[in-house]
């Protein structure tokens, strides 16, 4: 290509220099018009060719220069949460999960993650009409390393001021959030096995832990989840849990329990009892097994005993006490 272009450039200069400057406007001497008639078409073609090849080379050079230029450095990932102050986050979208539970997706900057430890929660706040603040803890369910957004899965409780407030929010509204508040720090291969007993929205801290452990390819912890709900329609995050169980059959098992049998239900029904735990979680009580419990107060009372005052763990009671477990083996979210 270069061998062709150099002679072409010479030809263009030669032709352009021979074209009379005023040939286009005033009569010329006899015979001179032949030069103009022949010179203009050739000159136009040559100039066009010169422009084409010059442009092509210039374009290639520009493209090569762009390709060779170093990519702009990525912005470092930062944490959006502040443990000492409430930060307003804008609601991006809402996804209905069950008749009374929805996923609320909040916006972050592209290079921001929420800034959670696992397992941890945050506190949310809004002011009532009388100006009094309502503050409630919630556990985000999105991946701790996710950037650009984070999720809450929140069940609506009639008469519950915060849950009703969040369920009445529209995209563009903001919610004040502070944290994180560490609950039970999780480390790789910290336990040989973990038994989880959850009820209703008590699945959220369990899901956070399950997701964190299963994405760690170095971790070998076996996780057994017993998840109790009123009806099959009330099971929160079932699709996500089933997907994780299918992808990790040697590490994660889920048993769903509902209050009363329905026509097509094949799983266990009724309360989470000592017998049900022994049948579906035989690892309970074994060496280096930890039991996590989270659910509504009536379930907590019958399974593990309620938490103590000022957010302390309290004594182990109920079914887990009957199985010989103590505070050393059990953690209540």
Task: Name each model-derived stretch.
Residues 207-217:
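Histidine-anchored nucleotide/phosphate-binding helix
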Residues 72-173, 229-231, 259-260:
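Ferredoxin-reductase
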Residues 201-206, 299:
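Hydrophobic/small residue at the entry helix of a nucleotide-binding pocket
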Residues 25-52, 61-65, 226-333:
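Reductase modules of NAD(P)H-dependent flavoproteins
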Residues 55-83:
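Membrane-proximal, acidic/low-complexity disordered segments on the non-cytosolic side
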Residues 193-195, 290:
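Structural motif
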Residues 1-36:
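N-terminal mitochondrial targeting presequence
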Residues 179-190:
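A short, basic/flexible loop-to-alpha-helix module at the beginning of a structural domain
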